[in-house]
Design a protein with these regions (language model features):
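Conserved alpha/beta-hydrolase catalytic His-Asp/Glu region
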Residues: 125-160
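Flexible "cap/lid" loop of the alpha/beta hydrolase fold
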Residues: 84-122
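Active-site loop/oxyanion-hole signature of alpha/beta-hydrolase fold enzymes
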Residues: 32-68
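Conserved serine/cysteine hydrolase catalytic core
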Residues: 148-213
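Conserved HGGG/HGGXW glycine-rich cap/lid loop of the alpha/beta-hydrolase fold
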Residues: 1-45
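Short beta-strand immediately N-terminal to the catalytic nucleophile in serine-hydrolase-like folds
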Residues: 69-71, 96
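Gly/Ala-rich beta-loop-alpha elbow adjacent to hydrolase catalytic centers
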Residues: 71-75, 79
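Catalytic active-site module of serine/aspartate enzymes centered on a nucleophile-bearing elbow/loop
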Residues: 204-239
């Protein structure tokens, strides 16, 4: 039986792998899907601190030669560092709205967004539920009605101890030299995220796609995103 291409899916903030990638389940017919729950997310325990560079180290255990990596949001920042650390193991890299706003510093939309995020982290509510509501509005994610589940509240607590992704010094030189193809995806809902994705496209020599309709969580579109990702991965598999 022919081996399926290996696809490592790296989730972002607030929700775990199961919730982040629920619309990608059909891809299991075409790929070997590996979607770990990062530390601090259900069903695991709370953590005291999250750092995207440390997460990249932790994610190395899921790499095998020829792995395709796709990361959403904070997981996209982690994936950029992972790919730079172990380029010899990657066959392709896809990032979906990584909040590496530092790369777009000087672009007004990104600067304004960073200011609002920093204000929320510094002076926003300390109650996890209220902190999460404010965060979801800022990034353009949907806000559940009613009370948050215990799982979402744990995700909120983890969010509050994340190292700000705007601090990320993306290893552009290493990534640009890496021979595998790159894809940068955004949801067409935010000038700030578009600014980041535009810089990544240029500096990485990446392909670029915009899929509107699901805000920040582009993968929740399901089939349109799945076909984009599958086509990109299958092209990367070609000799």
């Amino acid at each position: 039986m022919e081996t399926q291409p290996r696809l490592l899916l790296v989730h972002g903030s607030v929700v775990n792998a199961d919730l982040t990638w629920s619309a990608q389940k059909p891809l299991a017919e075409r790929f070997e899907i590996v979607a770990p729950n990062r530390r601090g997310f259900p069903p695991g325990p709370d953590v005291e601190h999250v750092d995207f560079e440390d997460e990249a180290l932790w994610l190395e255990q899921f790499l095998e030669p020829g792995t395709h990596v796709a990361g959403h949001s904070y997981g996209g920042v982690c994936s950029l560092f992972l790919a730079a650390r172990r380029p010899e193991l990657l066959r392709s890299l896809t990032v979906i709205e990584p909040p590496a706003f530092g790369v777009a510093r000087g672009i007004p939309a990104a600067d304004e967004f960073m200011s609002r995020i920093e204000e929320h982290w510094t002076n926003g509510p300390r109650d996890p539920a209220e902190f999460l509501r404010g965060f979801l509005v800022l990034v353009g994610s949907s806000t559940p009605s009613g009370d948050f589940t215990p799982e979402l509240l744990q995700g909120a607590r983890t969010l509050m101890v994340e190292r700000p992704p705007s601090e990320a010094v993306i290893p552009f030189d290493e990534l640009a030299r890496a021979p595998f193809p790159k894809l940068v995806v955004s949801g067409g809902h935010s000038a700030a995220f578009d600014a980041v994705c535009g810089v990544l496209e240029e500096r990485l020599g990446a392909e670029r796609a915009v899929l509107p309709g699901a805000g920040h969580s582009v993968q929740r579109l399901g089939e349109p995103f799945n076909e984009l990702l599958a086509s990109f991965v299958e092209r990367a598999e070609e000799p």
